Amino acid sequence: MESEDVQALVIDNGSGMCKAGFAGDDAPRAVFPSIVGRPRYTGVMVGMGQKDSYIGDEAQSRKGILTLKYPIEHGIVTNWDDMEKIWHHTFYNELRVAPEEHPVLLTEAPLNPKANREKMTQIMFETFNTPAMYVAIQAVLSLYASGRTTGIVMDSGDGVSHTVPIYEGYSLPHAILRLDLAGRDLTDYMMKILTERGYSFTTTAEREIVRDIKEKLAYVALDFEAELQTAASSSALEKSYELPDGQVITIGNERFRCPEALFQPSFLGMESAGIHETTYNSIMKCDVDIRKDLYSNVVLSGGSTMFPGIADRMNKELTALAPSTMKIKIIAPPERKYSVWIGGSILASLPTFQQMWISKEEYDESGPSIVHRKCF
């Protein structure tokens, strides 16, 4: 590939937010919700230039009259037509580039169905005519961004959480664990517990308001039971939030009850282990000789690890599970919301990476299955 002078595009398609930009940059140029909105009503004003669908921030700002759909659920694309719209919007409206002129690096969750990455590959080459592309595993990119080659990444986004142990740059597939519990589930849970307080949030548009409440006010308690006691006996933990219509609501123990579900999935009626236990289980599936290195390099990544207090709590929980002499270090980089994208930007601009791209020629020769041979 003679793409030396052409900047590669890096697109981190999250279940909740799409992060896009140019390889070599230190932050994504465009960050917008992975949403496609369609009008709930028929237009009556002629000449308003109404569209049959809106994408990203445009959909977000008109949410009162739209039905919002997320084409990516639990890290897996469930609606390819909408996904294509999001990519089209990314190239032409956000980045303002011609996709046929740039190699494209996409990301995906580990343990995704094979068909998912094949279809991504097919759309990139056949619909957008990209000269080259690559699909990278999200957690591996986060580790790159933290400047490490060994560690265990606990990545929790909007749709999926997973723990990926990586040793000397190799991910250890047998020890990767996936947890279909992430930000969107926390938002839904917040909707539910706010209902108990007498505030009703039901529509897709109202869910976005609750997501904002969660992002602005929620935190992780170091000791959940003690925090509940504190919340019950004083109003020190209460915060108020103004809704778009001016009504002010007060939230108290919901602030830490919501993200507690990451550590106690039983709150959501799920039988799975919490993120701390999943991390521990993942480490235990690795060779006994490398566990020490993993315990001392637990890297948090993704938007659902942005809650204040999460690193301290993670440290406390892992310390309780691990052997008593083990040194445990949780790394929570401030830019971890975007660390997958940043890692992608680093990877796509490495000189050694240039021979890793899948070229249009290779695709035409082998078809979509080439992605399994060239990308891991």
UniProtKB/Swiss-Prot annotation:
Pfam families cross-referenced by the UniProt entry: Actin
SUPFAM superfamilies per the UniProt record, alphabetical: Actin-like ATPase domain (SSF53067)
Chief localisation class: cytoplasm
Localisation per UniProt entry: Cytoplasm, Cytoskeleton
Gene Ontology terms for molecular function: ATP binding; hydrolase activity; myosin binding; structural constituent of cytoskeleton
PROSITE patterns (UniProt xref): ACTINS_1, ACTINS_2, ACTINS_ACT_LIKE
Ranges in coiled-coil conformation: none
Gene3D superfamilies given in the database record: 3.30.420.40, Actin, Chain A, domain 4 (3.90.640.10)
Keywords per UniProt: ATP-binding, Cytoplasm, Cytoskeleton, Hydrolase, Nucleotide-binding
GO biological process, one term: phagocytosis
Catalytic activity, as annotated: ATP + H2O = ADP + phosphate + H(+)
Assigned EC number: 3.6.4.-
Family: Belongs to the actin family.
Purpose: Actins are highly conserved proteins that are involved in various types of cell motility and are ubiquitously expressed in all eukaryotic cells. Multiple isoforms are involved in various cellular functions such as cytoskeleton structure, cell mobility, chromosome movement and muscle contraction.
Protein name: Actin-3
Organism whose genome encodes this protein: Dictyostelium discoideum (Social amoeba)
Gene this protein is translated from: act3
